[in-house]
C-alpha cells in the first residue's frame, strides 16, 4: 500500500526534522551486508555514531560499561598520535596496535560521537537488528526502522515499510532521513536568527 508507506515515511521524516531541530543524537545501525557502507555513509554525513559490524550486547542497556570501552579506545588512539606509545617495546606496541584494530571494528563507529545514550535509534531491517530494537525498547529510546511489509513492526515507533534487502531502497531511506534531519537544523538556525533580530522600532505617536 503506497499511501500507507508514504504516511509512515512522512511521520519518520517529521521525527527526523524534530531531532535535527533539537540537535539530538541518533545511533545508526545496519549490520547486514547490503546496508553496512550505506549506514556508515549516512551516519558520517550527520556526524552521528553508527554500528555496521556485529551489535555488541549491552550497547544501550549496559551503556556505562560500553562507554568505558569507547573511552579506552579513544585513549589508546590519542596516545598513539602523541607518541606516548613510543616508550613501549616494539613487541608491546604491536600488541597495542592489534588491540586498537580489534576494538575499532566494533567500537570505531561509536568512538567519536557517542558520549551518552542516543535520543533515537535508526535500524535497517528491524528483524535482522532485533537485539538492538529490544535494547532500545528497554531503555525507552524511540526506534525508526526500514522493514519489509511482512515484518512485525512491534517495538518500532516509526516503521517505514520498504525493501530492506535492496541497496537502492536502503540508500533512499537513509538519505531522505538525513535530509530531514538537516532541514531541522536549518529550521532551528532560522528561528534563532529571528529571535536575535532586534524588534523594528515603532514610530512614536503623540496623541494631542
Description of each model-found segment:
Residues 1-163, 167-193:
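Ribosome large-subunit tunnel/peptidyl-transferase-proximal elements
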